[in-house]
Amino acid sequence: MWKNIVIVLLYIFFRLYHLQNSFFFFNDWGRDMLVLLKWQQGGLPPLLGPLTSALPFNQSAVYFYLLYPGFLLFHGHPVSSVFTCLLFYLLGFYFIKKVFKLNSPLLIIIFLFSIHPQLIIQNRFVWNPSFLPPLLLISIFSFYFLVKNYSSTHLFIFSSSITLAISLSYSAAPLLISFFIYWLLFSRKFIKRYLLSLFSGFLLFNLPTLVFEIRHSFFLTKQLLYQSPANQFNNNLISRLSSIISNLFSTNNPGINWFIFILFIVIAFYFIWHQRFNRGLPFYFSFLFLTTLIISLLLPITFHYQYIFPLLCLLVLVISSFPRFPKIILILFLSFIYLRPSVFQSYFKTPQRTYAQMDQCTKSFCQSFKEPIFVSTQASFHTFHNGPEHRYLLRKNGCQVKDIETDNGQADFMLVVEDGSRLTPDINFYELDLFGKYQEYKYYPCTPQFNLRLIEKVNDPPTSN
């Protein structure tokens, strides 16, 4: 019992320690908070989730429905997403323990989840892929027992977890393909029940999207069919594999990453060959890992860190199925790599501007300026200029924030948030182009790294006939 408590407390520690002053409120997080704020102020839930980077299509709005109770409970503070995500994981772990009775593997899973850099980072900076791992684990375990001994309960758990995971992030789709290949090779039973259950899950979790499509003459579907997706394909197989390995093991040492990867491939093939007749959990985990890896390599998109979760979950499961001695050695080695002081301290460092500083600065501005404004940002650490995190805070603090793309002409002022940088006459970007000619109206200093510059539109004088 004490082992369970210690490991769960370790997991919680890495998610919450020094969170108030170290969480980095930025871009996608601000986008999500802005959607939730509009829901709160307008009373209507969103029908679409976040837009995907690989396809011109949106994820399910279920993501926002998961975040909304915490958003209300924390009075709009973005840290609510971290607590929602933490609770989601803990409930997922509890569900696995109670339903599948896998206490020993679960402790290893929670421990490795606790210390893996990508999981810590993406649990302290929450967006839609952050919720995948518990759902993926549940789907993996339930599918194993489903194939071994079919039951309607396991089918319901499997279809619900995998369809919700894919609805939250399409990066979970390769795992579903791997499930199908495994079923095709080793089961081939109850196909109609599988398909009906999966279809029902996708329909349920994407019902808001379907409502949007019906209302807007299938706008997203037409966009998906006729608009070319962003060109993300990297046809260099070694480069794609290196990206996967780097994000999967996250040791910051390419040589160590490749060594562990090759070791895993050898062990996975060993499990598959050694258990080819009884097909126990080691065989099952290894088969899914290799199959999902191959599918990920063949997909026509660049492999980004947010796509790592299906492979990462399977990697941890393969480790949990190792024989006792090599399992202990590998866990100790990964612990040494992941818990080095330089890595450990990086999770808790204070950003160049804290949320409290941003909130105080925007609140002061909104108290003094009551005209409608557009918002953009000039930053030193990214190239985005739409600034959803700043639009959220300004709107939350009472400013009349307009959208430069949809409401152009409804404001004569633009607030440029200088986030570690300065707006100089030689700088230009899309939002400034839309705004037009301008002159500086007022400067609002807040901190050495975070300031506000209000600019005013300059209209050309009318020409005489």
Per-range role (PLM):
Residues 1, 139-157, 165, 184, ...:
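Membrane-interface transmembrane helices that cradle and orient dolichyl/undecaprenyl
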Residues 9, 83-103, 138, 142, ...:
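Transmembrane-helix motifs of polytopic, lipid-linked glycan transferases
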Residues 14-18, 30-58, 62-65, 69:
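Extracytosolic helix-loop segments that constitute the early lumenal/periplasmic catalytic or substrate-binding loops
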Residues 21, 33-42, 66, 173-274:
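Transmembrane-lumen/periplasm boundary regions of multi-pass, lipid-linked membrane glycan transferases
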Residues 61-65, 73-91, 122-126, 256-260, ...:
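Loop-to-helix entry region of an early transmembrane alpha helix in multi-pass inner-membrane enzymes
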Residues 109-110, 154-170, 180, 201-204, ...:
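Membrane-interface alpha helices of multi-pass inner-membrane proteins
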Residues 123, 282-325:
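Hydrophobic/aromatic-rich transmembrane helices and adjacent perimembrane loops
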Residues 333-448:
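Catalytic lumenal/periplasmic loop and adjoining terminal transmembrane helix
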